[in-house]
Amino acid sequence: MAVDVPKSVIKKLVFFTVAMVVLPLLTFFTLQHLTSNTIISGGLAALMANVVLVGYIIAAFTEDTTEYAPEGKESKKE
């Protein structure tokens, strides 16, 4: 019983997954290079992870779901 997942959903998920890994690490090591304070580097890396998470939540809520409606159910916009 396979489910057809739209490519835009997969692309969005892959983008935010990569961003969740890369941005905090990039932030941590960049700030670690600029300053020797590990607390600041770690704190801002955690902040970047939260920024990515909030961005994903906003993108998920603003996604247009009418085009993904099952064939048997019509949207109420008619």
UniProtKB/Swiss-Prot annotation:
GO terms for biological process: vacuolar proton-transporting V-type ATPase complex assembly. GO terms for cellular component: endoplasmic reticulum membrane; endoplasmic reticulum-Golgi intermediate compartment membrane; ER to Golgi transport vesicle membrane. Residues 1-12, 60-78 are cytoplasmic. It is a multi-pass membrane protein. InterPro entries: Vma21 (IPR019013). Disulfide bonds: none annotated. Keywords: Cytoplasmic vesicle, Endoplasmic reticulum, Membrane, Transmembrane, Transmembrane helix. Residues 34-38 are lumenal. It is found in: Endoplasmic reticulum membrane; Endoplasmic reticulum-Golgi intermediate compartment membrane; Cytoplasmic vesicle, COPII-coated vesicle membrane. PANTHER family: VACUOLAR ATPASE ASSEMBLY INTEGRAL MEMBRANE PROTEIN VMA21. Required for the assembly of the V0 complex of the vacuolar ATPase (V-ATPase) in the endoplasmic reticulum. HAMAP family: VMA21 (MF_03058). Belongs to the VMA21 family. This is Vacuolar ATPase assembly integral membrane protein VMA21. The lineage of its organism: Eukaryota, Fungi, Dikarya, Ascomycota, Saccharomycotina. The gene is VMA21.
